[in-house]
Amino acid sequence: MFVIQDGVGDRPVPALGGKTPLEAANTPHMDSLIQEGSAGLMDVIGPGITVGTDTGHLALFDQEFKNNYYRRGPMEAVGVGIFLNSGEVALRCNFATVDSDFNILDRRAGRIRDEAKALAYSLDGLDIAEGVNVVFRSATEHRAVLVLKGDKLSEDISDSDPGDGSAEHKVLEVNPQSDHSHARRTADLVNRFIQYAHLILQEHPV
């Protein structure tokens, strides 16, 4: 059995005497597993390189992942039963709590669970542009998948999530990461989806 404790490391907390939550926690079952097996530290990519969930898992299971790298969106899409066709773009999403200025209050919306399905249903099929079909599905807890179907789409766009460790706490504008018109179009579509989704979800009874 190969146990991956993704994200469990955390950071030291002053209220815990400078310990991380894991160091301060009572973990008898984890301790037992380690005593019966083996544990250690490793640099998944290289010394000093912080990796995300997708990169870390791919590196652990596929030594050739640098040549076979798939972004997280397509993997999340398959996880909820959506299989992509050529030219379609899948994005891994979070339900998040924001204020009226798009300042992020909670990147995971309180780790919402069953209610996420109702929220996702209200966004599925959203009309953001002629010739573009929107598929939106809830995944585990606060996670969701956005699939854009249509012509002239590109995966070469930036993220709207500043991330946990960022000094920025506002939803970021999605920008093209290439000069291709398809990337510019896709970035505009995703920004439009975010704006429309905010208008719909802020009035949602959930």
Q: Which residues are covered by each model-predicted region?
A:
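Beta-strand elements within well-structured catalytic alpha/beta cores of enzymes
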Residues: 1-11, 33, 193-196, 206
